[in-house]
Structure formats: structure tokens, C-alpha cells
């Protein structure tokens, strides 16, 4: 499973999230919404960092951060039909 930290590079919250991830996570990749604006459109990430867990099939398995409850419910509804 891959962990993605979605940030906005000029945001103080993002700096704090990156520092937290460096301390707490073994491996993660940073996705800057300024470089990948489609991520912001898909996940609604604007100014608040969001942590995504992506499985081996490229599907988002878990979401933490902004609107996490909404995304997790949408994913659960999609899985359970």
C-alpha cells in the first residue's frame, strides 16, 4: 500500500503535515496540488493537507484529513453497492 500526502506547497498547514509525515511514516510520497491540480478536483483538497492510502490496484483505500468522513463513506458505498 502506498501513502500519498496531498499538499499545497505554500501553505503552513502543508509544511506541518510534511514534518509530521517525516516523523511518523516510513514511506510516503508528496503530491503538490499546484503541480497536479486534478488531485484537488478529485479529492477536494484545497488548503488542508490530506493523507491518502492507495492499494496495489491504484484504488484509494483510506483517506485522512479534510472531508475524510465523506470520502470514506463514498468509497464504502461504492464497495457495498
What are these regions (language model features)?
Residues 1-24:
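Local sequence-structure signature of Cys/Sec-based thiol-disulfide redox active-site neighborhoods
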Residues 12-13, 35, 69:
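Short alpha-helical
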Residues 39-43, 74:
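CheY-like receiver
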